[in-house]
Amino acid sequence: MIKLTPPMGWNSWNTFGENINEKMIFETADVMAESGLRDKGYEYLVIDDCWSLRERDENGRLVPDPEKFPHGMKAVADYVHSKGLKFGMYSCAGNMTCAGYPGSYEHEFVDAETFASWDVDFLKYDYCYHSPILHGKYLYRRMGLALENCGRDILFSACSWGADETHEWIKETGASMWRSTGDIFDTWDSVKDLVAQQEKLHPYNGVGCFNDMDMLIVGMHGKGNVGLAGCSDVQYQTHYALWAFLGSPLMIGCDIRSMSDETKAILMDKDIIAVNQDPAGRQPYQVLAHPDYPVWAKQMDNGDIVLAYFNLGEHNFNQFVTWADIGIERSSGVKLEVTDLWSKQTLGTFDTGIEFGAVVPHGCRILRCRVVRG
């Protein structure tokens, strides 16, 4: 499957871990459809690890845990589809999944056929307990080939954590998205750590094969499977803006059945989502390079430029960007009309540059700039 914009959806792992069941999945599908998330673009509902029995059946096929999913996975898929959503599942390139359930190693084709028979639309494919002999590219090529021949269009999400220089070979596998890092946790330090690993990977991200910075922690507040210290709403807003601006898939990880208004506002901001889903799929570039106070720019398909200032430091800090910094010389006569994407305020038309103002620690400001001539 070729995906033209970063996939969006929800995944069970961050909050629920192995504590998943049919009732919770149905309730989550209901909320995705009724809250507005689906209509904002969150279309995939993905069940992560721990959904199967510990052993395959006598025919070598994976078996859903009947206590967790008493009606089977086809019934779950049917319910998810009835809500206008797409259904995702999980497996692993090793002989076991990360939680110790059967993996797909040397069962790639039979498992792909099984997923297709359940009407699965998305497969997250992890990298635990993988063969020490085979390079990751061979293991992911195997499942990619199996999915391409299973008789159903299934989005392939490769989760190899950036191991074995994933970025150099992942497009060979047919994957539409690929994890570039280890797992995220619900802390500000985890967000900063994952962002710091992205700069060298920008050339490998884009239309058809997106760099996955891991699921979102927005709205978790220290609860759930990867919940640790938690983050403030300001930090969650910056985390979301970073993932969106850098072109990562946007996979919600909180329990959306109990979202706060603040969480909803972050996850459903149409203007930030539009930056992530821009059809050009261009990568951002640094305008002002600073480890704690960077400013990035990104060119949109319609010619607009988005400027993003992320305060990753511990002090209020102002930044100023001149239009020359983004390639517009004063002699061109070009001005930029600037809109703040979070506040929705039009700030005015500027002919030489713009001052961001003092952004609070761990906060951000995202400005969309429209070219005005004459």
What kind of feature is each model-predicted range?
Residues 107, 138, 149, 155-255, ...:
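Glycan-recognition surfaces
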Residues 24, 28-132:
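Aromatic-lined carbohydrate-binding/catalytic grooves of carbohydrate-active enzymes
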Residues 243-246, 251-253, 289-330:
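Carbohydrate-binding surface patches
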Residues 13-15, 50, 92-96, 128-130, ...:
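Active-site beta-loop-alpha junctions enriched in small/polar residues
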Residues 348-374:
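C-terminal beta-strand-rich structural cap/linker in extracellular carbohydrate-active enzymes
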Residues 238-288:
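Catalytic cores of secreted or luminal carbohydrate-active enzymes
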Residues 325-344:
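Solvent-exposed beta-hairpin/edge-strand motifs
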Residues 6-12, 41-47, 86-91, 121-126, ...:
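Structural recognition of the beta-strand scaffold that forms the well-ordered cores
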